[in-house]
């Protein structure tokens, strides 16, 4: 059956700021306390969405979350009106304010793990929300992510959206950023590659930075998503590269159809894994980048592998890259050699995503890949699909509500909270989502 990969990109939220919240993510740490530009961040993301939609790649949008997230501050013991809660936390524990104001939901590669209908036992598309247990600020995302996905994939005959796994370290799950699918045409059954960093009883794990994904979580997600057990491989990420800042697999590898583009040191027991994939995926092609050409450090600083590998109708592929790759002589030299070599990659497309990149999120972090048949695509909430009208409406919306400068101190401004709620109220109507945000359901207004 014919099917297409639709990229659902996260829209950057109004409180996008640099707080260095993500230990193990070196860009996040390096840019801590810099002044951010939420308006520019949102527009950079929108430009990528529109350019890819214009190039013929199906593209949709996932909206930001409510931030600052007052309900969690109340759980932490801060009381009074919303304004009083903000004032108290800013004075007594500003680090909590930064955490509950993070715009990290923009990186929707961590929102969920997807199983296309061709791979599932019941013939539905399955989406399991990620618990993002390893980082407090990200663990706050699951409930609203579930509401958003249910509002977008709202036909229960075609889509099953599963709640996140229990919030414990043993079941740490980071979503599609640690998941690849390999195979022929999108509508054919594919091989799902789940990548984990640690498992109980296995001493092979990183020592400097945390391994965020567990094998136990990956196995549970595969079960929830009803993936045919014959179409699953579990592989461990190389713990040494996690210790060099590769906090998700999508920082060191990207797949599309029959191609796996990865660093030579991406996986533990890599040659064994690639042999397994060759045996089980027709036409499998591994493009392994040697450490002698691109070091792990350079891969992390340029986000070479946090790229999007997209298929054209003629079978050729386009690699979508951040501008940092073009600015690094060694990486850009390698990429031009890659273009000239015998492989499906025939075009490099570069985007300026600096605002997101400075927090450690490149092109692949910003998108959730969902393979859909034509019938399934028609069942998706049409208001989220990118086109000229939506692009213009979202740009106008960003111009109206987003600030062009934000510091950590600004997060305590009650006006920012009010601006955010008004903006999301308008956006949820624009995208026909219903009342997906807690402040809407509580009838809390802007107070």
Swiss-Prot record:
Annotated catalysed reactions: N(2)-succinyl-L-arginine + 2 H2O + 2 H(+) = N(2)-succinyl-L-ornithine + 2 NH4(+) + CO2
UniProt GO MF annotations: N-succinylarginine dihydrolase activity
Q: Which SUPFAM superfamilies match?
A: Pentein
Active-site annotation: 174, 248, 365
InterPro entries per record:
AstB_sf, SuccinylArg_d-Hdrlase_AstB
Give the family this protein belongs to, as stated in its UniProt record. Answer: Belongs to the succinylarginine dihydrolase family.
Its name, as the record gives it, is N-succinylarginine dihydrolase
């Amino acid at each position: 059956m014919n099917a297409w990969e639709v990229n659902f990109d996260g829209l950057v939220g109004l409180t996008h700021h640099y707080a260095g919240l993500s230990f193990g993510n070196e860009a996040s740490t390096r840019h801590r306390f810099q002044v951010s530009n939420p308006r520019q961040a949102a527009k950079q993301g929108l430009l990528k969405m529109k350019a890819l939609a214009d190039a013929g790649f199906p593209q949709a949008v996932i909206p930001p979350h409510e931030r600052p997230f007052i309900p969690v501050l109340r759980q932490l013991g801060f009381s009074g009106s919303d304004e009083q809660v903000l004032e108290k936390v800013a004075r007594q524990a500003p680090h909590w304010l930064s955490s509950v104001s993070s715009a990290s939901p923009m990186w929707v590669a961590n929102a969920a793990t997807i199983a296309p209908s061709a791979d599932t036992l019941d013939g539905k598309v399955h989406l399991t929300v990620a618990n993002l247990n390893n980082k407090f600020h990200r663990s706050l995302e699951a409930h609203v992510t579930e509401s958003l996905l249910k509002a977008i994939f709202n036909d229960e005959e075609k889509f099953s959206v599963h709640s996140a796994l229990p919030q414990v370290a043993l079941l740490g799950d980071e979503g599609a950023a640690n998941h690849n699918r390999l195979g022929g045409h999108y509508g054919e059954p594919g091989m799902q590659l789940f990548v984990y960093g640690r498992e109980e009883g296995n001493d092979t794990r990183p020592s400097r930075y945390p391994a965020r994904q567990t094998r136990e979580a990956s196995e549970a997600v595969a079960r929830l998503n009803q993936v045919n057990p014959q179409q699953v491989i579990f592989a461990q990420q190389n713990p040494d590269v996690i210790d060099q800042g590769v906090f998700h697999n999508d920082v060191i590898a990207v797949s599309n159809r029959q191609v796996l583009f990865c660093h030579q040191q991406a996986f533990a027991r890599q040659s064994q894994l690639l042999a397994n994939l060759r045996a089980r995926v027709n036409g499998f092609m591994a493009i392994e980048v040697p450490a002698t050409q691109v070091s792990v450090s350079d891969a992390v600083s340029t986000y070479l592998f946090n790229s999007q590998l997209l298929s054209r109708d003629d079978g050729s592929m386009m690699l979508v890259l951040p501008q940092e790759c073009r600015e690094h002589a060694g990486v850009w030299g390698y990429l031009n050699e890659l273009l000239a070599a015998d492989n499906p990659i025939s075009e490099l497309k570069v985007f300026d995503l600096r605002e997101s990149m400075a927090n450690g999120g490149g092109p692949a972090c910003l998108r959730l890949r969902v393979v859909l048949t034509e019938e399934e695509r028609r069942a998706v909430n049409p208001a989220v699909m990118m086109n000229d009208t939506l692009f213009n409406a979202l740009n106008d919306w960003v111009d109206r509500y987003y600030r062009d400068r934000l510091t950590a101190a600004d997060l305590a401004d009650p006006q920012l909270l009010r601006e955010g709620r008004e903006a999301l109220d308008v956006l949820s109507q624009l995208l026909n989502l219903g009342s997906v945000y807690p402040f809407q359901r509580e009838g809390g207004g802007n107070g």
